Amino acid sequence: MGKIIGIDLGTTNSCVAIMEGNQVKVIENSEGARTTPSIIAYMDDNEVLVGAPAKRQSVTNPKNTLFAVKRLIGRRFEEKEVQKDIGLMPYSIIKADNGDAWVEAHGEKLAPPQVSAEVLRKMKKTAEDYLGEPVTEAVITVPAYFNDSQRQATKDAGRIAGLEVKRIINEPTAAALAFGLDKAEKGDRKIAVYDLGGGTFDVSIIEIADVDGEMQFEVLSTNGDTFLGGEDFDQRIIDYIIGEFKKEQGVDLSKDVLALQRLKEAAEKAKIELSSGQQTEINLPYITADASGPKHLNLKITRAKLEALVEDLVERTIEPCRIAIKDAGVKVSDIDDVILVGGQTRMPKVMEKVKEFFGKDPRRDVNPDEAVAVGAAIQGQVLSGDRKDVLLLDVTPLSLGIETLGGVMTKMINKNTTIPTKHAQVYSTADDNQGAVTIKVFQGEREMAAGNKLLGEFNLEGIPPAPRGVPQIEVTFDIDANGILHVGAKDKATGKENKITIKANSGLSEAEIDQMIKDAEANAAEDHKLRELADSRNQGDALVHSTKKALTEYGDKLDAGEKEAIEAALKSLEDVLKDTSADKAAIDAKVEELGKVSQKLGEKMYADMQAQQAGAAGAAGAAEGAAHAGGAQQAADDVVDAEFKEVKKD
């Protein structure tokens, strides 16, 4: 059985790790980096770029370069968070036929799981290159506050990438695993994981207990905001730059997608620089042009200005911390350690706010970019049976329930319940002789069902006629270890049953996923064909070069007919190499043809080289003989025998 890899599928960056024995290994990608930008570019020639190569060309291809797609995964187009992003992203966010938020590149509609699968495929390939064997299983992390649709969509992305997702685990929990197993401290302790990433924010309160030599990680509570992260911090800087430029130059850059892409890069860079410096300069020459000529952007930003721009965003992370502490039934003073995860936590203002709330300095010995992937790899080792000393008890982040009479949300499983869990409850009909009931499943904390997220609905039909309130319908909620919900309804009188895994009226159907898997496999086959074609072209180019060189040196030793045949075959190969539509077979045929007619030329070269070597060997032998004769007397005087051996070369 192959290794189960751990993947942190991030909004901004992704990371892959594996366990080697009890040592964790974060794997470098083909560019030599330990994290890969979660950026996917669709090129004109159907090539798909992932990671750093996609990021490098984003300025010139903004409409077809997709980033922060994780913010859309498992979301409906109408959601206010999606609507907010439509105005900010240089690429198109569109409404799919099922009402989900999809994206568009080169006129092709793409589901977010399909796009995220490209990043997962890159992570899979990174691990395979390192291990030298195929990888088929993975543990993938998600924000703790992801709802059922978002978890299901992440699992779908794994399938499309050719991975069997053994477990979906929460990012803060994964970071706690990485932290807990790295420390030698014994005894029970409570930790807070504050995870502010590129697109999402989570906070989890976790108890690490030592139970008979086994490390038990129990999540006491979790809270967060799945639409708050580093991307929002970047956007504040972008908006500020646009405003300042408009004041100075009278030009609105927000309508210029090329300029926006350059601004995004500059904003991210400025934000990072201001984590260590007090001031930075944004310098973008030729950012745009008007009738008076080109315009250049030059702007200084201080750390104080940045902090003022994002103050409310940092403040927004504190309320979820307060709720998580309350839900866990602990006091702030009970927290032994605070762990920071996610690149945005490097901002001094964020660290300061966290210290202010928790009353202690956050730990600095956890790598905020890699801890989540490390934790996922540890969980992979646990699931493969190679590690027995770790037990993970996670929770469901949001309450789950059904809509009952009057549009009320009746909770079946409360938030922060340890998973896996199962709950059954008996309901009845609202009308006399009601033959069917529709079960609508919701996730959220609002009292009325309409204020929560509708996960899906299904019907239980064939209920025998009876007065209202008489039929006994048992509804069962079952949450698996991935945090994914399975619901069943059963008429206790007839035994009729209807079960669903929540797919909602959104999400991808099995047929769509299968098609995407086929497309991905076809792309892999196409990539292989393109690589083989490139190899043939390279072989052809090399043969053209070597044949031309040989003709220059030895062409005069050939008969006129032989030389003409070679020149004709050479031209034929050059023509086919110039033809961009030529396939591998056509190139290979011309390479073979030139190889055959060049045989005589090769023989002439070989014979010439042999003659040269024989001549050189003969001259060397004669020189050695003369030296031997002339030095004989001296050798005798010195009483040293010098032996010479001539080596004949074939």
From Swiss-Prot:
Signal peptide: none
Keyword 4Fe-4S tagged: no
InterPro entries assigned to the protein according to its UniProt record, in alphabetical order: ATPase_NBD, Chaperone_DnaK, Heat_shock_70_CS, HSP70_C_sf, HSP70_peptide-bd_sf, Hsp_70_fam
Induction of synthesis: By stress conditions e.g. heat shock.
Keyword Chaperone assigned: yes
Pfam families cross-referenced by the UniProt entry: HSP70 (PF00012)
GO molecular function, one term: unfolded protein binding
Top-level taxon of origin: Bacteria
Region Disordered: start-end pairs: 614-634
Disulfide bridge map: none
Residues recorded as bearing Phosphothreonine in the entry: T200
Family under the similarity heading: Belongs to the heat shock protein 70 family.
Name of the protein in question: Chaperone protein DnaK
